[in-house]
Amino acid sequence: MQNINEIEELIKLISKLPGLGPKSAKRIVLKLINNRDELVKPLASTLDQVYKNVTRCNFCGSLKSNLSGCINCENSKEKYNKICVVEDIADQWSIENSNIFQGYFHILGGTISSVGQRKEDLLINSLVERVNKENIEEVKLATSATVEGQTTAYYIQDSLKNTSAKVTKLAQGLPVGGEIENLDDGTLFSAFKNRANLNSNSD
């Protein structure tokens, strides 16, 4: 393959996407080149609009448009008494697609970890504020069954101890080390249905 700088750079960028390596990236680039008008132009335009207008909501963690605000917390048409807390937006999408939860979502933006992610970096304070502001009755913790996910869940439980909300956590249906976005609908359903009440374990 000839060294064309623009092509090489595009292949490098695409190969950084999840699940894609250099070979897959090359196939995608060839598909784009062979469909310049149908794919390249609209893709470039859409990516430009996403870059300019789509950001992360600083309150709930969801994606929002700078043109219309956040439909997850600012402009939600529905009123709920439950919030499901997840680590990232991919987890929210997985749960939404499974149709097992009707309520608000709160995206933390990661987990507390020993490699630099601090609790101050996560949207935990705004979660407490939402629980009080929206009169939330139940907070469902849907963090991953990893050490970091469980550490984060227990810290959130402690942060919510002075609220009236019941705090529950996904149950044994969630395999140890399992990440939410990789679970099938059946496993998610079992984990939600058999979730554990953490309030009873509080002092």
What residues fall within each predicted segment?
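Solvent-exposed alpha-helical segments within well-ordered globular domains of core cellular machineries
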Residues: 8-12, 26-30, 41, 45, ...
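Core recognition of P-loop NTPase motor domains used across DNA-transaction enzymes
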Residues: 39, 44-47, 58, 71-72, ...
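Conserved phosphate/pyrophosphate-binding and hydrolysis machinery centered on Walker-type P-loop NTPases
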Residues: 18, 37, 50, 63, ...
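Extended interfacial segments that mediate partner engagement and assembly in macromolecular machines
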Residues: 25, 75-143
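Conserved, well-folded catalytic cores of nucleic-acid-processing
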Residues: 13, 17, 35, 50, ...
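Cys/His-rich Zn2+-binding cysteine-cluster or related metal-binding knuckle/ribbon modules and their
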Residues: 2-7, 16, 26-84, 88-92
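Long C-terminal interaction/binding lobes of large macromolecular proteins
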Residues: 24, 128-203
